[in-house]
Amino acid sequence: MMTTTTGVTEESVVKDWSGELRGRDILCFSHDWSGDPLSKTHLMRLLARDNRVLWVNSIGYRAPTASKADLSRAFKKLAAAATPVREPEPNIFVLNPLAVPAYGSPAVRAFNRRFLRWQVRRAMRRLGFTRPLNFVFNPAASVIAGALGEEMLIYYCVDEYTQFTGVASQSLAELEVGLMRRSDLVIVSAERLYQSKAAHNPNTILVRHGVDFAHFRRALDPETRVPEDLARLPRPVIGFFGLVADWVDMDILARVAGSFPEASVVLLGKTTTDVSALERIPNVH
């Protein structure tokens, strides 16, 4: 769910969108569908109520290393590409594309453009997709965005992708700028993103992230069962809900814990980075 800078409520946004986008074909270039459900996932689930969505799994931001994690991901990508387009949820179809994750070379970009276009168009033909609306969350998809017969191209930016660890920042930045200039609309989720993207496209708007109100308000319902390991913690509880990755400001979390020593600071979510400094703080859980 979301709130806009115009003061429109999230309920009216959903109603308006479902009314405008009915019976349409939608492309979505994002992270892997099997990964954690992010804002893109929730948005496409809403749109899939009245439309069909072809979700194109992640096109890599960076060249893989010889690490165990990267090799495992590469093998999983190869195996997934051998499977046909599947429908994990009603009206949501998932394609596992193959591409060479190296964007500094013009030759590689040209190869990816042709190969990815062929893969996506083949999936579109099999599903009978026509005049799609293309929601691009992954700037690496710039290599084919706008070349798929789209009626509208939308770049939906929720992160400063060029600052991710291990990314070929300059090459990805070039792809992103080209994508923004070609897009009919650029949507950003934060003020800082608006400041950095609006110069590349006059049709840039800010739509901040929101939450599923009905889901989270259950925390105030006395009938909601609190897990035992949380129930026994000292009150109040200061919660962090989400992925704990290397872009999370650990210093701020540590300062919050130090400023409220009587409270319990609870981090709920998958951890993919070193949190040993936080683990040494007594009231961080």
What role is predicted for each listed range?
Residues 274-285:
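Nucleotide-activated donor-binding/catalytic signature segment of Leloir-type glycosyltransferases, i.e.
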Residues 54, 182-190, 205, 239:
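A short beta-strand/loop micro-motif in the catalytic core of glycosyltransferases
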Residues 142-143, 157-169:
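A short, histidine- and acid-enriched strand-loop-helix "catalytic/donor-clamping" loop
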Residues 43, 118-125, 146, 168-186:
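Membrane-proximal helix-turn-helix segments that form the acceptor-binding/catalytic region
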Residues 17-21, 220-237:
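Nucleotide-sugar donor-binding and catalytic loop/hinge architecture
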Residues 229-248, 254, 265-268:
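Conserved donor-binding/catalytic core segment of Leloir-type glycosyltransferases
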Residues 2-77, 258-260:
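N-terminal subdomain of nucleotide-sugar transferases
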Residues 192, 207-222:
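Carbohydrate-associated surface elements
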